[in-house]
């Protein structure tokens, strides 16, 4: 609708080294960038503090951008939780590498730092290490009405849990 192309740029590390924070934030690695969809001009970092978003979609109800975020590995079977996050305005920060969801990140000592005060929390928590990839808001007419406006997400499944989970299609209702 806005003529912009939104691209997620995942972290190239399980947890980024401290000396990469400024560079990655400046160019949008571990974030979401946007640019003119027709000629690539007006590129800007739209959001930061994201580990590895793969799927994203615009909510047709309010136009906000929602996305999945894959978790840090090696912290345990059930932490950190997977996330579905909503961007409501440009410049939002989602906490990574200091926190992911409700879990402080221990690698490189990020858990010893004060938690940044400007963290926007996820809208939905998913199973840890299920690897939520694609997602889409459902607006079709083939499924019952309870699915309208909700999110279908695809999980490719875990590789690093004691008891693997996935691959599966999940549904998240956004109705209160």
For each of these PLM feature ranges, what is it?
Residues 6-9:
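A conserved catalytic-loop motif detector
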Residues 1-3, 84:
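Short amphipathic alpha-helices and their capping/turn segments at secondary-structure boundaries
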Residues 3-4, 63:
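Loop/turn elements at helix/coil->beta-strand transitions in domains of secreted/extracellular proteins
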Residues 11-19, 26-44, 51-52, 57-176:
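Beta-propeller domain segments
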């Amino acid at each position: 609708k806005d003529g912009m192309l939104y691209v997620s740029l995942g972290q190239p590390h399980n947890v980024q080294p401290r000396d990469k924070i400024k560079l990655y934030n400046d160019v949008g690695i571990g974030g979401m960038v946007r640019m003119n969809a027709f000629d690539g001009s007006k590129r800007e970092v739209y959001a930061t503090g994201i580990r590895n978003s793969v799927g994203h979609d615009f909510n047709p109800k309010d136009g906000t951008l929602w996305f999945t975020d894959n978790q840090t590995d090696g912290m345990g079977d059930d932490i950190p939780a997977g996330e579905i996050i909503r961007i409501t305005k440009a410049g939002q920060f989602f906490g990574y590498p200091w926190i992911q969801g409700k879990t402080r990140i221990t690698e490189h000592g990020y858990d010893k730092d004060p938690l940044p005060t400007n963290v926007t929390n996820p809208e939905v928590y998913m199973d840890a290490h299920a690897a939520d990839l694609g997602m889409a808001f459902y607006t079709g007419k083939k499924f019952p009405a309870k699915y309208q406006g909700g999110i279908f997400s695809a999980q490719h499944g875990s590789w690093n849990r004691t008891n693997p989970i996935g691959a599966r299609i999940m549904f998240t209702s956004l109705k209160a």
